[in-house]
């Protein structure tokens, strides 16, 4: 990039600088790029930047210096001219040749060596430019590219004002511009989640490089920040621009944001949405229970008032029935909303894309049955039918005109199943994340049955009491309503009489003084008897559990019994020893033997032996009873501790053995190197000995040369001078 704000591709072998360019380069790089060709080269060949000269000849150096001086003079003349103002940019634009464009990232990359190739550069991709690009952008001048003459190879690039973006990171620009020389392809980063917490604006530097045809230059389209499905600058081909614009305003704004929003939800958003659905489902269940119980209470009030105070055709009855119908409609809406939340939770938990996957036949049947149960209620208006029954003791038929509300009112008690649902959703075991995690690891399904089991374990008496009293009251009122049209003596139609009938049926007593007349009352008594048998069994189990000793009480009891049995064993053993001594005394030590006393002590001796055996047997039984599951678990813990200690000791032993092995290996290596050391030591001693002999021999030769005979040894040492086992070593 030169001082005029133009960009020169220096350092690339296929791009050359044109000496006729109106925008000269500056510095040493321009001098190296614009060196003239050698004299032998023809003028039509494009100038190539010469490589580094190694040890040039003096004439060549002089020629290069002259050429450089001429180039510097030309550059100074060109630099004295003003820079390209905005009017001149418009003139330069008319002289441009429209070439094939390369759709690139904001960083420049290597362009091919052709006269019709340019590249669009982002204004922030070259930060070292001296041209005021901001003024260029404010002037709204179109992007222009300048090419040299037919013989030139340089490409002067100007920034395009069509792209508007924030200032880029210089370190990012350096890393991206290195791809021009290293051949790397700039790929976009992976799209992050589109949730509200981690929405980030995508950078246009991450767009991949795409090559377009010379006849169809790219068109730059800038997306707004309000676009939910783009978030980044898109470069479209002009042939497909109209299709993208037309489709983006219609289908893109409706379908694409929803799909991307669903796909780009991260785990945190899903967990938060799941927790919100849990809370909404719990509130819907609470509201459904409230409206269901409200309808039951209003139904009971309307039934009792229409029997004694006013008739079914009165305004009070109509108002109460309308209130029941309104509560029923609200209840049905709440149930639909509840199951909608259930389906949404299923979709989130299983990662499904379509909610229809959750709508199995079983779920549809369950929802339909629940809607049918909750939809039953007395219809506003007066509707009657003839009810025929046979009396219990006289067996005479009885015919009466009854209200249809009896058939529609009694099934409303089936709405009480909502209590179990509310108990499940409000249970600590169901709402606590830790308990649910532990249950999932142990393959436990948290449902209503599990919650009822835990309640029966924690407070069995309270659960049975509440269940029995509720069943007693509901069954008594149902029998009273069923029997009121055929009870001429007012026995079972009385509420207290009905409670007595239900109580004796519940306890499976059945005195027979009161019996139902209608099939409705008989059916209620049958269900009451079945539920009473189950409740009685549960009561017996609860009482037996309450009478059972706890673990601490069992341990204390076993300890006390063991202590008493130990004392009895000691007493029985002492009695055996005492009777043995007395028998020995009366038979051996006394002069006159008293046979009566001997038989008496023998009898006591046998009794003491049997007593000792019996106490030992009781002690064995107590020890067997003490070996319960708790003791076995304790023994298991003790054995586990012992095994752990043994493992620790074995690990220590292995470490010691390993250290011994390493030491043995070291000793083995030392022993293996010992012969070499001994050989080296002996060799050194032999050399020292030979040196001493040579020195001694030299001294003796110097003293008596004429007296010593000539030596045949190659080193001039006589064999007699070496010590032998049979000679003296005084010469040493």
From Swiss-Prot:
Ranges that cross the membrane: 289-309, 316-336, 367-387, 406-426, 455-475, 524-544
Membrane topology: Multi-pass membrane protein
Coiled coil: 643-670
GO cellular component, one term: plasma membrane
Chief localisation class: membrane
A GO term for molecular function: protein-containing complex binding
Low complexity bias (residue ranges): 60-82, 139-148, 718-732
Positions of modified residues (Phosphoserine): 168
Chemical reaction(s) catalysed: K(+)(in) = K(+)(out)
UniProt feature, compositional bias: Polar residues: 113-133, 241-257
Highest taxon of source: Eukaryota
Calmodulin-binding: annotated span: 562-638
Pfam family, one: SK_channel
Entry comment, domain topic: The coiled-coil domaim mediates heteromeic assembly.
Family label: Belongs to the potassium channel KCNN family. KCa2.3/KCNN3 subfamily.
Subunit structure: Homodimer. Heteromultimer with KCNN2 or KCNN1; this modulates plasma membrane expression and consequently the small conductance calcium-activated potassium channel activity. The complex is composed of 4 channel subunits each of which binds to a calmodulin subunit which regulates the channel activity through calcium-binding. Interacts with CALM1.
Function: Small conductance calcium-activated potassium channel that mediates the voltage-independent transmembrane transfer of potassium across the cell membrane through a constitutive interaction with calmodulin which binds the intracellular calcium allowing its opening. The current is characterized by a voltage-independent activation, an intracellular calcium concentration increase-dependent activation and a single-channel conductance of 10 picosiemens.
Protein name in UniProt: Small conductance calcium-activated potassium channel protein 3
Originating organism: Rattus norvegicus (Rat)
Gene assigned in the entry: Kcnn3
């Amino acid at each position: 990039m030169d001082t005029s704000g133009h960009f020169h591709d220096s350092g690339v072998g296929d791009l050359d600088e044109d000496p006729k360019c109106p925008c000269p380069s500056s510095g040493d790089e321009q001098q190296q790029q614009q060196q003239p060709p050698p004299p032998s080269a023809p003028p039509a060949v494009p100038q190539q930047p010469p490589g580094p000269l190694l040890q040039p000849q003096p004439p060549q150096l002089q020629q290069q210096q002259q050429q450089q001086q001429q180039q510097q003079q030309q550059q100074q003349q060109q630099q004295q001219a003003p820079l390209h103002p905005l009017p001149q940019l418009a003139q330069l634009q008319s002289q441009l040749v429209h070439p094939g464009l390369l759709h690139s990232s904001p960083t420049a990359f290597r362009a091919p060596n052709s006269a019709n190739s340019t590249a669009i550069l982002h204004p922030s991709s070259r930060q070292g430019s001296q041209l005021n690009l901001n003024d260029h952008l404010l002037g709204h001048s179109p992007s222009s590219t300048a090419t040299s003459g037919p013989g030139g190879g340089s490409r002067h690039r100007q920034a395009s004002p069509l792209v508007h973006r924030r200032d880029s990171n210089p370190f990012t620009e350096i890393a991206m511009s290195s791809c021009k020389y290293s051949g790397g392809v700039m790929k976009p980063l992976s799209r992050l989640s589109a949730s509200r917490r981690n929405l980030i604006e995508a950078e246009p530097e991450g767009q991949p490089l795409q090559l377009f045809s010379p006849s169809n230059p790219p068109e730059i389209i800038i997306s707004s920040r309000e676009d939910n499905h783009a978030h980044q600058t898109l470069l479209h081909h002009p042939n497909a621009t109209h299709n993208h614009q037309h489709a983006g305003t219609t289908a893109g704004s409706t379908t694409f944001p929803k799909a991307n929003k669903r796909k780009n939800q991260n785990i945190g958003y899903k967990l938060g949405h799941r927790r919100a659905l849990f809370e909404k489902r719990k509130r819907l269940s609470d509201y459904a229970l409230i409206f269901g119980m409200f309808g039951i209470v209003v139904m009971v009030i309307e039934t009792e008032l229409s029997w004694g105070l006013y008739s079914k055709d009165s305004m009070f009855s109509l108002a109460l029935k309308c209130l029941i119908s309104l509560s029923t409609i609200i209840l049905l809406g709440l149930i639909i909303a509840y199951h909608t939340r259930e389906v949404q939770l299923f979709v989130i938990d299983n990662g499904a894309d379509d909610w229809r996957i959750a709508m199995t036949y079983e779920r549809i049947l369950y929802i339909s049955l629940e809607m049918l149960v909750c939809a039953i209620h007395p219809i506003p208006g007066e509707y009657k039918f003839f009810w025929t029954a046979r009396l219990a003791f006289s067996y005479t038929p009885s015919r009466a005109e009854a209200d249809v509300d009896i058939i529609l009112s009694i099934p409303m008690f089936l709405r009480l199943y909502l209590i179990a649902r509310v108990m499940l959703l409000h249970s600590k075991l169901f709402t606590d994340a830790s308990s649910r995690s532990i249950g999932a690891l142990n393959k436990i399904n948290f449902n209503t049955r599990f919650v009822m089991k835990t309640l029966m374990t924690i407070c069995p008496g309270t659960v049975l009491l509440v269940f029995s009293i509720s069943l007693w009251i509901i069954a008594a009122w149902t029998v009273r309503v069923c029997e009121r049209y055929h009870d001429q003596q007012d026995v079972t139609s009385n509420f207290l009489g009905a409670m007595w009938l239900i109580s004796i049926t519940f306890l499976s007593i059945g005195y027979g003084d009161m019996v139902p007349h209608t099939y409705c009352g008989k059916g209620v008594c049958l269900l009451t008897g079945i539920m009473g048998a189950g409740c009685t069994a549960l009561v017996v189990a609860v009482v037996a559990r309450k009478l059972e000793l706890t673990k601490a009480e069992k341990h204390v009891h076993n300890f006390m019994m063991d202590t008493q049995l130990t004392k009895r064993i000691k007493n029985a053993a002492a009695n055996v020893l005492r009777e043995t001594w007395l028998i020995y005394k009366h038979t051996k030590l006394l002069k006159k033997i008293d046979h009566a006393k001997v038989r008496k002590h023998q009898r006591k001796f046998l009794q003491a032996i049997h007593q000792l055996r019996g106490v030992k047997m009781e002690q064995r039984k107590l020890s067997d009873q003490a070996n319960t599951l708790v003791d076995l678990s304790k023994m298991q813990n003790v054995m586990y501790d012992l095994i752990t200690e043994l493992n620790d000791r074995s690990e220590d032993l292995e470490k010691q053995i390993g250290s011994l092995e390493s030491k043995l290996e070291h000793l083995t290596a030392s022993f293996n190197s010992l012969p070499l050391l001994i050989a080296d030591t002996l060799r050194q001693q032999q050399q020292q000995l030979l040196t001493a002999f040579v020195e001694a021999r030299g001294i003796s030769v110097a003293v008596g040369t004429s007296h010593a005979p000539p030596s045949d040894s190659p080193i001039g040492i006589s064999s007699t001078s070496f010590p032998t086992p049979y000679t003296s070593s005084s010469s040493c």
